[in-house]
């Protein structure tokens, strides 16, 4: 891999037309490679209402702070951008899951910030539900059990099993994040990327992308090395893009597991320069995804093509959602200058 320069002279903080970026969002828009055009599911508004009802049913928005977070995060909008072709039922499951993961992630961050061990009851309950079908003991666990039920009713047994496996990996990743946050020494960029991959929470949605197809993928297609590589590339790109837009918020909160902030620590540069370096890394990832997909597409089944298009949808959707979601509004207040 070519060495990335971090000198002020070699990092251009302007768009291709040479017009200087005003704020970080301008900078990201100007430099990020996004080959996938904007799309939106027509059932977005119904999904948003469904999310509100589902969260209320399980008592997750009884806390005003959680209700405010959901309002600023717009989980149904993210689902609609990621899955523009999903039917209304599958879109609702995806939207519920996104909302759940935001609640779960924020709760885990609050609990484990200073003492990772305090996360163990919460994470153990989730693993017991996902792995063993154990009954929940908390409102958050009850919501997860219901989400698991929704997936089992809509997906094939194999798809539901993959969903549960990927979801357990996400749960385990949150403990890694808590340990990294509590560690006195900064996390180096390679380890940061590894932890970020674990807590991305994107791959649990890929079985839903498969469920949106006319039939299951054959095992040899689903587990082909190229398909596994496409899954990794798309999940990483999809979660790193929001890292660009959340960098200001995470920096103020003392966050460690963020791609842009990892570059800033490693290269001791300004946040705009770090964002530019992170964009370069993301661009190379998206291009590798695009090139590999182009190579294998002629060999894929129609369901395989739809499955990979679902992965691409996460790259596209996370970008267009991150640009305007109130959760990352700080991006508009941060100057793009070095």
Swiss-Prot record:
EC number of this enzyme: 4.2.3.162
Positions contributing to Mg(2+) 1 binding: 105, 109
GO molecular function: lyase activity; metal ion binding
Residues the record lists as binding Mg(2+) 2: 109
Binding-site residues, Mg(2+) 3: 246, 250
Cofactor(s) for this UniProt protein: Mg(2+)
GO BP, sorted A to Z: terpenoid biosynthetic process
Catalytic activity field: (2E,6E)-farnesyl diphosphate = (-)-alpha-amorphene + diphosphate
Intervals of motif DDXXE motif: 105-109
Site positions for Plays a critical role for substrate recognition: 106, 177
Keywords: Lyase, Magnesium, Metal-binding
Site feature Plays a critical role in the stabilization of intermediate cation, where: 102
UniProt-listed InterPro entries: Amorph_synthase, Isoprenoid_synthase_dom_sf
Segment forming the signal sequence: none
Stated family: Belongs to the terpene synthase family.
Function in brief: Catalyzes the conversion of (2E,6E)-farnesyl diphosphate (FPP) to yield the bicyclic sesquiterpene (1R,6S,7S)-(-)-alpha-amorphene via a probable 1,6-cyclization, which could involve the abstraction of the pyrophosphate from FPP to yield a (R)-bisabolyl cation. The only accepted substrate is (2E,6E)-farnesyl diphosphate (FPP).
Protein name: (-)-alpha-amorphene synthase ((2E,6E)-farnesyl diphosphate cyclizing)
Organism: Streptomyces viridochromogenes (strain DSM 40736 / JCM 4977 / BCRC 1201 / Tue 494)
């Amino acid at each position: 891999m070519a060495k990335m320069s971090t000198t002020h002279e070699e990092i251009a903080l302007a768009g291709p037309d040479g017009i200087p970026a005003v704020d970080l969002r301008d900078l990201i828009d100007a430099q990020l490679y996004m080959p996938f055009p904007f799309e939106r599911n027509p059932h977005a508004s119904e999904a948003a209402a469904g999310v509100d009802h589902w969260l209320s049913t399980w008592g997750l928005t009884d806390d005003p702070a959680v209700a405010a977070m959901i309002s600023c995060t717009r989980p149904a909008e993210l689902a609609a951008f990621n899955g523009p072709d999903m039917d209304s039922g599958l879109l609702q499951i995806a939207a519920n899951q996104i909302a759940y993961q935001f609640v779960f992630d924020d709760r885990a961050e609050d609990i484990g910030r200073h003492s990772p061990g305090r996360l163990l009851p919460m994470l153990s309950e989730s693993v017991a539900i996902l792995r063993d079908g154990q009954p929940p003991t908390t409102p958050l666990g009850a919501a997860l059990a219901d989400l698991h039920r929704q997936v089992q009713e809509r997906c094939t047994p194999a798809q539901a099993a993959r969903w549960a496996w990927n979801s357990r990996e996400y749960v385990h990743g949150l403990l890694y994040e808590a340990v990294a946050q509590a560690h006195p020494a900064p996390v180096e960029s390679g380890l940061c990327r590894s932890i970020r991959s674990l807590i991305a929470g994107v791959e649990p949605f890929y079985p839903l992308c498969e469920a949106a197809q006319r039939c299951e993928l054959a095992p040899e297609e689903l587990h082909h090395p190229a398909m596994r590589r496409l899954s990794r590339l798309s999940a990483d790109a999809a979660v790193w893009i929001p890292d660009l837009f959340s960098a200001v918020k995470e920096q103020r909160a003392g966050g460690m597991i963020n791609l842009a902030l990892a570059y800033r620590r490693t290269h001791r540069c300004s946040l705009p320069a770090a964002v530019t370096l992170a964009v370069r890394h993301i661009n190379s990832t998206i291009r590798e995804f695009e090139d590999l997909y182009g190579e294998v597409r002629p060999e894929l089944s129609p369901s395989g093509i739809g499955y990979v298009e679902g992965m691409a949808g996460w790259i596209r959707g996370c970008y267009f959602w991150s640009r305007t979601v109130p959760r990352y509004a700080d991006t508009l207040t941060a100057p793009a200058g070095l």
